[in-house]
Each structure stands twice: as structure tokens, then as C-alpha cells.
């Protein structure tokens, strides 16, 4: 009888653990996905339309230098090109890959944006490009993390 009670207790514990594991799979990351998407949307709109002051609010502290760098390299010719564009950049989040419970990568397609390639050269319009934007969750919010200025992903043929 003692053996059956122990076996029953063990099965009950395993069932409880399995249930907890299954329900925790519904949310394997911190923060809400809606908040993550909102961060990506707002950042993409600000950054790719050259509203760097707004983009600055959405990056982590280590990334601020990249936004400041981009803003410091805007010239009058760039401003004139931006004003001449019939509409601003548009974008679409293609996918989100959660790399851990507090980090993610958002894959974004950006269309009709003005790109600054090389410092000192004129910017040019890009019809479409894909970007991978890294994010991390800290202080109850998702933040964009930059290790350089965002660059288009290379196409694999």
C-alpha cells in the first residue's frame, strides 16, 4: 500500500510539473508581444523617416551613440531629398524571433526610404530592403539594441 501511495504521489507531481511546463510555453519571453511590436513599429517609422530624436527614445543606453551619429551626419542635401519624397518610408514586421526570454530579433521590410550609405556622399532612395532589429527587455520595456547603424540584410540567392 505504501508503494502505491508513493507511486501515486510521484505521478501527481509529474502531472503537475508537466501542466506548469505546458502553460509556461505560452509565454516564453518577458513583456508583451504587443509592446515589442509597438517598439519596432515606432522605431522603424522614426528611424527610416529620419526622425532621430524620436528614435532615440526607443533604444537602450548603449545604442544612443548610433542614433546621435546618424543625426550628426545629416546635411542640407539630405533634408532637401527627404522633403522632395512624395511619401515617407513604409515598413512591415515580417517575423519576430525570441532568442531568449528577454531578447528578440524583429525582421522588418522597409520600402521607399532614403538611405545614407557613406558619410559625405548624397543619400539615395531605396525601393525595398530587409533589416534585422535586435531588442532586449529591460526596465519593464522592450528597447532596440544597435551595435552599428541598421544595415540591410544581404539577400541569399
What spans do the regions from the language model cover?
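Residue-level signal for short amphipathic helical patches enriched in basic/charged
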Residues: 20, 47-50, 62
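Short solvent-exposed beta->alpha transition segments
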Residues: 37, 52-113
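Short, low-complexity N-terminal intrinsically disordered segments enriched in polar/charged residues
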Residues: 24-49, 57
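Intrinsically disordered, low-complexity segments enriched in polar/charged residues with Gly/Pro
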Residues: 6-7, 32-33, 82-84, 119-123
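Exposed beta-sheet edge and beta->alpha loop/turn motif
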Residues: 98-157
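Extracellular/secretory pathway and lumenal proteins
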Residues: 15-17, 29, 149
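Sec-dependent bacterial lipoprotein signal peptides
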Residues: 1-23
Amino acid at each position: 500500500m505504501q508503494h502505491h501511495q508513493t507511486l501515486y504521489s510521484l505521478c501527481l507531481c509529474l502531472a503537475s510539473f508537466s501542466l506548469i511546463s505546458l502553460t509556461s510555453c505560452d509565454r516564453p519571453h518577458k513583456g508583451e508581444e504587443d509592446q515589442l511590436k509597438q517598439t519596432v513599429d515606432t522605431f522603424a517609422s522614426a528611424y527610416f523617416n529620419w526622425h532621430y530624436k524620436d528614435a532615440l527614445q526607443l533604444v537602450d543606453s548603449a545604442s544612443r551613440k548610433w542614433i546621435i551619429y546618424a543625426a550628426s551626419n545629416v546635411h542640407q542635401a539630405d533634408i532637401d531629398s527627404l522633403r522632395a519624397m512624395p511619401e515617407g518610408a513604409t515598413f512591415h514586421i515580417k517575423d519576430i524571433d525570441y532568442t531568449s526570454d528577454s531578447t528578440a530579433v524583429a525582421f522588418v521590410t522597409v520600402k521607399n526610404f532614403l538611405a545614407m550609405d557613406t558619410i559625405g556622399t548624397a543619400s539615395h532612395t531605396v525601393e525595398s530592403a530587409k533589416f534585422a532589429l535586435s531588442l532586449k527587455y529591460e526596465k519593464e520595456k522592450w528597447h532596440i539594441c544597435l551595435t552599428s547603424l541598421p544595415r540591410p540584410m544581404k539577400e541569399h540567392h
